[in-house]
C-alpha cells in the first residue's frame, strides 16, 4: 500500500487554533502604538467625508467598570465600522476632571482646603490626582482595543478647555440666558458652608413631628370645591392640615402642595369637651391614619374632590399675617402625613422646584450659622434646632397645632461633624429656561435629532418640559470659575462683562483656573474695583462637560460642530445629553448632535445591578486578563444594548464559545489558502464551480445586510448574522462539502482553485466584518492573508471584490438553500444507519433520494457530483412513489432517503468507496478520480 499523503493538499497555517488572547493582545497593542496605527488611519482616510462621534467624558476617579467598557467598546465598534465605510472618523477621548469626588480624595490625604494646604496648593493636588486617574483609566481603555487619539485627549482641566468654558459661559450671558436667584442646598451650620450630596450621610434621629392647621381664607368658596350632598356642608372652621418633621421651617412656609390626581376629602370633626367642631381637608387615603394619630373618634366625610380642584386656594399662614396658595406637585405621596405638603421653597429641593413653577418667593430667614436672621418675626436670633420647641408652643398658643409627637427617622448629617444639617436657600447663578425661549428652542431641536432607541426622544422631551432653571453655580474649590464681577449695590453684572471674561479666559489659557482666583480686581477694573465683587463660585461640572461641544468640536483640529453622534448610558438623558442640548441651543440655537444613541446598564443573570456587597461584579480587567479583550468586545456587540445588558461568567463563557466558532472558521479559511496567490490563481466568476460561486454570492449579499446593520447600530444583528453564516452556510454546509475537493483535487487544477477563490473572497470580507468587533483577531487574520496588503485592516474599506457576485440568482440560491435542507434529511438517515451499525462513516454509504418530479429534476442536474454534496460515496435519485417504508422522510418536502452500505473497496487517498478501486493498473488502491488528480490534468467539477 502506497502513502499518498504527499499528494494531498493538506491545510497549513500559522494561525493557531487557540487564541491565547490574554497573552497575545497586549503584544499586538504594543505594535499598534509603536507604529502609530491611529495616525495611519487618519492619513488613510484624509479627505474622506467626516463622521464625528463625540466622546462623553467619564469622570477621572477610580478604575473603569463594566459599564465604562460597554460604552467605550460600542463607540469603538461604530468608529471602526464608519472608517471601513470610508469616513474620516477621528475619535478624541475625553475626561471630566473637576468637582467634588476628586476634592474628597485629595481632602482624605491633605485635609480640607485652606487648612494644611492653601487653596492654590489644594487645586494643584486635585489636578495631580485627576491625572493619575486618567493615566490608569487610559491604560484600561486602550487594553480594550479602543483606538483613538489617546496621547491628545481632551481634559476639562486643560488650561485651553478651562478658558474655553469661560468663553462658552460668556456667549450664554451675551445671549441673555443667565440670571441670579436662590436655591436650597445642604448646609452644615458647623462648617458654615454648603455640602454636596457626597458629603452627606444619613443617621437615625428623633424629630418633633407636628400636624398644623392652615385655615382657609374663604370658607364658602373652599367648601364649594367639594362635591358635598346638598345642605350637608358641615360646621366649624375649615383648615388644610400639613405635617412636618422640621417645625423650624414653618416660618418659611410659602405654599401647600397637593397631588393633582389624588382624592381629597373634607372631613367633619365633631365637637368634643375641649375642642369645638371643625372641618379639615386631608388626602382621602390618609383620613383614618390621621384621625387615629389625633385620637379623634367622632368624624365623618362631607365631600370629595381632586387635588387639581383645590389649586389656587388661599390659606392663612399658621404663624404670620400672610396668605399662601395651594399648588400642585409630583412629589406628593400618601406614604405618611396628610397628603397636604408644607412647602418652604427656601428649605427643600422639591419645595424649591415646585415653587419655581409657580413663581413663589424663595424665602430663607436662616443665616450661615443656622440662626434666624434679625428680621425674622418671633424667632430672630434663635438657632433653628433650638427653635423647634418655641415654634410648637406658638402654634399651640394660636390654636393651629393639631398634634405633636416624637418621630424617629433617617436624617441627613454632615460627614465631617456628624451633626444634623439643614436645607437653606443661598444665592446661585442659573441658566434660565424660559427668559429667552431656551426651553422652547431645546424642544424644537429635539425633534430634529435621530434618537436610538426612539423612546429616547419622548424621554428627553418630558425632562426638558419639566426641568427648572439650571443652577450652574457651586461653592467648591476645584472647578472652572464663574469669572464675572457683580456690582456690590445692585448685584448687576459689570457692563463690560464680555470683554472682561475674554481677558480672564486669556489668563486662564496661560495659567489655568488659578489665574482667576489669584486675580486682584484692580488688575482689570482699575478704580472701579471697590464697586464690584469678584464671584468665587465655580461652575457645575455638568456645565464643564455640557460645553465640550464648543471647547472640543469647535477647537480641535480635524473635528467639526455639530457632532454626528453622542452615545452614552440611558441615564444621560438627564445628564450629558441634556446639558449639551441646553448649552448648544443657548449658544448657537442648535443641538450639538445629529444622532443620540443610548445603551442600558449592566446587570447580572438575575437582573441585579453590579454590587460589591452582592459579589456579582464583573470587572473588565479580570475578563481581559482571563479571556481576552475580543471576548469582552464580542459580548458587548452581541447584547441588545437598548435595554439592560446581562453579564456573568456563564454569559461570557458563551461568548467565548461563539468566538471559538468564528476563530475555527477563520483558521479553516487561512489553512486552505496556503499556496494561493490571488494575482495568479484567482478564478473568474463565470469559470467557478457553481457551489463556489453561490457561496461568494451569499457572502456578497450578507455584506450588504451587515453594512445596513452596522449603519443602524444593530450590532447584535451583525453578530447573529455572522455566527449564522459561519456556523450554518459555511461550517455545516459549504466547508463540509469542499473539504474533499480542497484536499484531493489537483493542486493547480480549476476544481481546487475555484474553491480557493471562494475562500479568498470570503476571508477578505470576513476579516473586515469582524474588525470593528473582534479587532485583535481580525488583525491576526489580516497578517496571514495572501496577497500584498496594507499593514492594518483598520485603514481599509469594506471588501470591494464582491461587486460582480452580489445578487445571487433566485433560482440558484433557492436550489442550494434547498440542498442545505436536503442534507439535513440525508444526515438523519446516515445517523440512523450508524446507530443500526449499517455504516461507520458517511463515505461507507450509498444513498438513494426518493423525490417528486420537480425535486428529482433539480437533483439530477448535479449528476455524478450529487454524492460530493452529500458526503457519500454514491448518490442516486428515484421517484418518491418507489420509496421503501423504512426510508427517512422529510417533513417539509416530497423527499425520502434510504441508506445502504457500499460493497466496494475504499480508495486509500480520498476514502470514497468506488467500483473501480482494486482494478486500476499501477494504482490498485485508488479510485479513478484520484488517479486523474495525481497523474492527469485533474478532475472537472461543474456544480460541487
Curated annotation (Swiss-Prot):
Reaction(s) this enzyme catalyzes, per UniProt: tRNA(Ile) + L-isoleucine + ATP = L-isoleucyl-tRNA(Ile) + AMP + diphosphate
Compartments it resides in: Cytoplasm
Keyword Disulfide bond: no
Signal peptide per UniProt: none
Cofactor annotation comment: Binds 1 zinc ion per subunit.
Binding residue positions for ATP: 612
Cofactor(s) annotated in UniProt: Zn(2+)
Main location: cytoplasm
Motif ('KMSKS' region): 609-613
GO biological process: one example: isoleucyl-tRNA aminoacylation
Positions bound to Zn(2+): 907, 910, 927, 930
Protein origin, superkingdom: Bacteria
Keyword Ligase belongs to the record: yes
Pfam families: Anticodon_1, tRNA-synt_1, zf-FPG_IleRS
Keywords of the record: Aminoacyl-tRNA synthetase, ATP-binding, Cytoplasm, Ligase, Metal-binding, Nucleotide-binding, Protein biosynthesis, Zinc
GO molecular-function terms, A-Z: aminoacyl-tRNA deacylase activity; ATP binding; isoleucine-tRNA ligase activity; tRNA binding; zinc ion binding
EC category name: ligase
GO cellular component, one term: cytosol
Function summary: Catalyzes the attachment of isoleucine to tRNA(Ile). As IleRS can inadvertently accommodate and process structurally similar amino acids such as valine, to avoid such errors it has two additional distinct tRNA(Ile)-dependent editing activities. One activity is designated as 'pretransfer' editing and involves the hydrolysis of activated Val-AMP. The other activity is designated 'posttransfer' editing and involves deacylation of mischarged Val-tRNA(Ile).
Family under the similarity heading: Belongs to the class-I aminoacyl-tRNA synthetase family. IleS type 1 subfamily.
Domain remark text: IleRS has two distinct active sites: one for aminoacylation and one for editing. The misactivated valine is translocated from the active site to the editing site, which sterically excludes the correctly activated isoleucine. The single editing site contains two valyl binding pockets, one specific for each substrate (Val-AMP or Val-tRNA(Ile)).
Subunit structure: Monomer.
Name recorded for this polypeptide: Isoleucine--tRNA ligase
Taxonomic source organism: Idiomarina loihiensis (strain ATCC BAA-735 / DSM 15497 / L2-TR)
Amino acid at each position: 500500500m502506497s502513502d499518498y499523503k504527499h499528494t494531498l493538499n493538506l491545510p497549513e497555517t500559522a494561525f493557531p487554533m487557540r487564541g491565547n488572547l490574554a497573552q497575545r493582545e497586549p503584544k499586538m497593542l504594543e505594535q499598534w502604538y509603536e507604529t502609530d496605527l491611529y495616525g495611519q488611519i487618519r492619513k488613510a482616510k484624509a479627505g474622506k467625508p467626516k463622521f464625528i462621534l463625540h466622546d462623553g467624558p467619564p469622570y477621572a476617579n477610580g478604575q473603569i467598570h463594566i459599564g465604562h467598557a460597554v460604552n467605550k467598546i460600542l463607540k469603538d465598534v461604530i468608529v471602526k465600522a464608519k472608517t471601513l465605510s470610508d469616513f474620516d472618523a477621528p475619535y478624541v477621548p475625553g475626561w471630566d476632571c473637576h468637582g467634588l469626588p476628586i476634592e474628597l480624595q485629595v481632602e482624605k490625604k491633605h485635609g480640607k482646603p485652606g487648612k494644611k494646604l492653601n487653596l492654590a496648593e489644594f487645586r494643584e493636588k486635585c489636578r495631580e490626582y485627576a491625572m493619575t486617574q486618567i493615566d490608569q483609566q487610559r491604560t484600561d481603555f486602550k487594553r480594550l482595543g479602543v483606538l483613538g487619539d489617546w496621547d491628545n485627549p481632551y481634559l476639562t482641566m486643560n488650561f485651553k478647555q478651562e478658558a474655553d468654558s469661560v468663553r462658552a459661559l460668556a456667549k450664554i450671558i451675551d445671549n441673555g440666558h443667565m440670571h441670579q436667584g436662590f436655591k436650597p442646598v445642604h448646609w452644615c451650620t458647623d462648617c458654615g458652608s454648603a455640602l454636596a450630596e457626597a458629603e452627606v450621610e444619613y443617621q437615625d434621629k428623633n424629630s418633633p413631628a407636628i400636624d398644623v392647621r392652615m385655615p382657609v381664607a374663604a370658607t364658602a368658596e373652599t367648601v364649594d370645591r367639594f362635591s358635598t350632598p346638598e345642605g350637608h356642608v358641615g360646621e366649624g372652621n375649615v383648615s388644610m392640615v400639613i405635617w412636618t418633621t422640621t417645625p423650624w421651617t414653618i416660618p418659611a412656609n410659602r405654599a401647600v402642595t397637593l397631588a393633582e390626581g389624588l382624592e381629597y376629602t373634607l372631613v367633619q370633626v365633631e365637637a368634643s369637651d375641649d375642642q369645638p367642631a371643625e372641618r379639615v381637608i386631608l388626602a382621602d387615603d390618609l383620613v383614618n391614619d390621621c384621625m387615629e394619630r389625633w385620637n379623634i373618634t367622632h368624624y365623618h366625610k362631607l365631600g370629595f374632590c381632586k387635588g387639581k380642584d383645590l389649586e389656587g386656594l388661599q390659606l392663612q399662614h399658621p404663624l404670620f399675617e400672610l396668605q399662601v396658595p395651594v399648588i400642585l406637585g409630583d412629589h406628593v405621596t400618601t406614604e405618611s402625613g396628610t397628603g397636604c405638603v408644607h412647602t418652604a421653597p427656601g428649605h427643600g429641593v422639591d419645595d424649591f422646584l415646585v415653587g419655581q413653577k409657580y413663581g413663589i418667593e424663595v424665602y430663607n430667614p436662616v443665616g450661615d450659622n443656622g440662626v434666624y436672621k434679625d428680621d425674622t418675626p418671633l424667632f430672630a436670633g434663635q438657632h433653628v434646632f433650638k427653635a423647634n420647641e418655641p415654634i410648637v408652643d406658638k402654634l399651640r398658643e394660636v390654636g393651629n397645632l393639631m398634634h405633636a409627637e416624637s418621630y424617629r427617622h433617617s436624617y441627613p448629617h454632615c460627614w465631617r461633624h456628624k451633626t444634623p444639617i439643614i436645607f437653606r436657600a443661598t444665592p446661585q447663578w442659573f441658566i434660565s429656561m424660559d427668559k429667552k425661549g431656551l426651553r422652547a428652542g431645546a424642544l424644537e431641536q429635539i425633534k430634529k435629532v435621530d434618537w436610538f432607541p426612539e423612546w429616547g426622544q419622548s424621554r428627553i422631551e418630558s425632562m426638558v418640559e419639566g426641568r427648572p432653571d439650571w443652577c450652574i453655580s457651586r461653592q467648591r474649590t476645584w472647578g472652572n470659575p464663574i469669572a464675572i464681577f457683580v456690582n456690590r449695590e445692585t448685584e448687576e453684572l459689570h457692563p463690560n462683562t464680555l470683554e472682561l471674561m475674554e481677558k480672564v479666559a486669556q489668563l486662564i489659557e496661560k495659567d489655568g483656573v488659578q489665574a482667576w482666583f489669584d486675580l486682584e480686581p484692580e488688575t482689570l477694573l482699575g478704580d472701579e474695583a471697590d464697586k464690584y465683587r469678584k464671584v468665587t463660585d465655580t461652575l457645575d461640572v455638568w456645565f464643564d462637560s455640557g460645553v465640550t461641544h464648543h471647547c472640543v468640536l469647535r477647537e480641535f483640529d480635524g473635528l467639526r460642530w455639530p457632532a454626528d453622534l453622542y452615545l452614552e448610558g440611558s441615564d444621560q438623558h438627564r445628564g450629558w445629553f441634556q446639558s449639551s442640548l441646553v448649552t448648544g441651543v443657548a449658544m448657537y440655537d442648535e443641538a450639538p448632535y445629529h444622532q443620540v444613541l443610548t445603551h442600558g446598564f449592566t446587570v447580572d443573570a438575575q437582573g441585579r445591578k453590579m454590587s460589591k456587597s452582592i459579589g456579582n461584579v464583573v470587572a473588565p480587567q479580570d475578563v481581559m486578563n482571563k479571556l481576552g479583550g475580543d471576548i469582552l468586545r464580542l459580548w458587548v456587540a452581541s447584547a441588545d444594548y437598548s435595554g439592560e445588558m446581562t453579564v456573568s461568567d456563564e454569559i461570557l463563557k458563551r461568548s467565548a464559545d461563539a468566538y471559538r466558532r468564528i476563530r475555527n472558521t477563520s483558521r479553516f479559511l487561512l489553512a486552505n489558502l496556503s499556496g494561493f496567490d490571488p494575482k495568479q490563481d484567482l478564478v473568474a466568476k463565470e469559470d467557478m464551480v457553481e457551489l463556489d460561486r453561490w457561496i461568494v454570492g451569499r457572502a456578497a449579499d450578507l455584506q450588504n445586510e451587515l453594512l445596513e446593520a452596522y449603519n443602524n447600530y444593530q450590532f447584535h444583528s451583525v453578530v447573529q448574522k455572522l455566527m449564522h453564516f459561519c456556523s450554518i452556510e459555511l461550517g455545516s454546509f459549504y466547508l463540509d462539502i469542499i473539504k474533499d475537493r480542497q484536499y484531493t483535487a489537483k493542486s493547480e487544477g480549476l476544481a481546487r482553485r475555484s474553491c480557493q477563490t471562494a475562500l479568498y473572497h470570503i476571508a477578505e470580507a470576513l476579516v473586515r466584518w469582524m474588525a470593528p468587533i473582534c479587532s485583535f483577531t481580525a488583525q491576526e487574520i489580516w497578517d496571514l492573508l495572501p496577497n500584498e496588503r496594507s499593514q492594518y485592516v483598520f485603514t481599509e474599506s469594506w471588501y470591494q471584490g464582491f461587486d460582480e457576485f452580489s445578487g445571487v440568482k433566485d433560482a440558484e440560491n433557492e436550489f442550494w438553500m434547498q440542498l442545505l435542507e436536503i442534507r439535513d434529511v440525508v444526515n438523519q438517515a446516515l445517523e440512523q444507519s450508524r446507530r443500526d451499525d449499517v455504516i461507520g462513516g458517511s463515505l461507507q454509504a450509498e444513498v438513494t433520494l426518493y423525490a417528486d418530479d420537480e425535486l428529482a429534476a433539480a437533483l439530477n442536474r448535479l449528476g455524478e457530483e450529487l454524492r460530493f454534496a452529500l458526503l457519500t460515496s454514491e448518490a442516486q435519485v428515484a421517484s418518491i412513489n418507489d420509496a421503501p417504508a423504512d426510508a427517512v422522510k422529510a417533513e417539509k418536502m416530497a423527499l425520502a432517503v434510504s441508506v445502504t452500505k457500499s460493497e466496494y473497496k475504499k480508495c486509500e487517498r480520498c476514502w470514497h468507496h468506488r467500483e473501480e478501486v482494486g482494478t486500476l493498473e499501477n494504482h490498485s488502491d485508488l479510485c479513478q478520480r484520484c488517479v486523474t488528480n495525481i497523474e492527469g490534468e485533474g478532475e472537472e467539477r461543474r456544480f460541487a
